[in-house]
């Protein structure tokens, strides 16, 4: 249901849910669930842990991260008998006073933008088991944006290492990755259950990175002769190429010819098209590599630091 206070989704709970499990859900207010679709009413089985399975295979860190990008994040606002209410992020406004639960091991500070990542910290519990209905829920970890890229890079490097190792056993036991934040060290342990999925993800990523780097270099190579030629008559370009040193050195050795006219320059601009295509490709690659923060911590009269497990007021960060 879309209102002035945001898009609110009702998650229906089974009637067999026990009182103990209902109390567990009440403690999940402020946590995030990922919806496969946005409707007025959603079943609990649509957002439970088994909904992330791919062909009956338990998801690993990379597959969860990929699924998070394709689903709709929603913050649980109320857990009532028979249903839960959640506000969908990234669609319109959010209600005033929306609170996010800090599910990560880090303290969130006022002004921090928050990313949502799969559970990768061994000492942080991000699952709850509802025994009465045989259901398990998975919640993402809240991570400050300035740490998210480092964690993602280390997760991808672990996947590349696992793929390169193949079937050969590792010579020594692989130690857990460690990151530093505010003077403290934290251990991350990404899981790689399905190497086929990891290989597909990492292979696509690396091929696009290599292609983008190669295309960027080729565009630069085509522009270097023009840059040096213009440097013979333009003082500003002289400064750009190294205070006239490069231009003077090349001019003393060879006579740079005038650049030929661009092919079909009278009706199109090949250099512009190449640059436009390359910028678009790098932007798409950046969207794959980056984790977009949807929320920003904004405390007015409360504590500036939000401890793990506490609720913090947030505002939208997707505009």
From Swiss-Prot:
Subcellular location: Virion; Host nucleus
GO molecular-function terms, A-Z: structural molecule activity
InterPro entries for the chain: Herpes_capsid_2
A GO cellular component annotation in the UniProt record: host cell nucleus
Record keyword Signal present: no
UniProt keyword annotation of rRNA-binding present: no
Highest taxon in the source lineage: Viruses
A Pfam family per the record: Herpes_V23
UniProt KW keywords: Capsid protein, Host nucleus, Virion
Main location per the UniProt record: virion
Family: Belongs to the herpesviridae TRX2 protein family.
Subunit structure of this chain's protein: Interacts with TRX1 and major capisd protein/MCP.
Role, per record: Structural component of the T=16 icosahedral capsid. The capsid is composed of pentamers and hexamers of major capsid protein/MCP, which are linked together by heterotrimers called triplexes. These triplexes are formed by a single molecule of triplex protein 1/TRX1 and two copies of triplex protein 2/TRX2. Additionally, TRX1 is required for efficient transport of TRX2 to the nucleus, which is the site of capsid assembly.
Listed name of the protein: Triplex capsid protein 2
Lineage: Viruses, Duplodnaviria, Heunggongvirae, Peploviricota, Herviviricetes
């Amino acid at each position: 249901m879309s209102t002035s206070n945001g898009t609110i989704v009702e998650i229906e709970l089974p009637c067999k849910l026990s009182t103990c499990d209902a109390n567990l859900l009440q403690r999940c207010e402020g946590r995030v669930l990922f919806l496969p679709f946005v409707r007025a009413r959603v079943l609990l089985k649509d957002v439970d842990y088994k909904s992330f399975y791919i062909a009956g295979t338990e998801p690993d860190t990379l597959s969860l991260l990929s699924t998070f990008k394709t689903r709709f994040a929603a913050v649980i606002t109320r857990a009532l008998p028979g249903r839960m209410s959640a506000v969908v992020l990234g669609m319109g406004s959010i209600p005033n006073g929306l609170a996010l639960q800090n599910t990560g091991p880090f303290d969130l500070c006022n002004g921090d933008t928050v990313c949502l990542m799969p559970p990768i910290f061994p000492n942080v519990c991000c699952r709850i088991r509802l025994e009465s209905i045989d259901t398990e829920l998975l919640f993402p970890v809240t991570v400050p944006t300035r740490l998210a890229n480092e964690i993602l890079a280390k997760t991808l490097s672990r996947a590349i290492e696992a793929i390169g190792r193949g079937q050969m056993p590792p010579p020594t036991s692989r130690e857990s990755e460690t990151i530093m934040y505010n003077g403290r060290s934290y251990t991350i342990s990404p899981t790689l259950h399905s190497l086929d999925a990891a290989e597909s993800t990492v292979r696509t990523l690396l091929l696009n990175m290599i292609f983008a780097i190669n295309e960027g270099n080729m565009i630069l190579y085509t522009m270097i002769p023009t840059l040096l030629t213009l440097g013979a008559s333009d003082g500003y370009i002289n400064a750009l190429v190294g205070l006239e040193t490069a231009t003077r050195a090349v001019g003393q050795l060879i006579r740079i010819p005038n650049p030929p006219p661009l092919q079909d320059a009278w009706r199109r601009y090949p250099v512009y098209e190449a640059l436009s295509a390359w910028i678009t490709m790098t932007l798409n690659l950046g969207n794959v590599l980056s984790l977009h923060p949807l929320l920003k911590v904004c405390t007015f009269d409360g504590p500036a630091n939000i401890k793990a497990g506490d609720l913090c007021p947030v505002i939208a960060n997707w505009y």
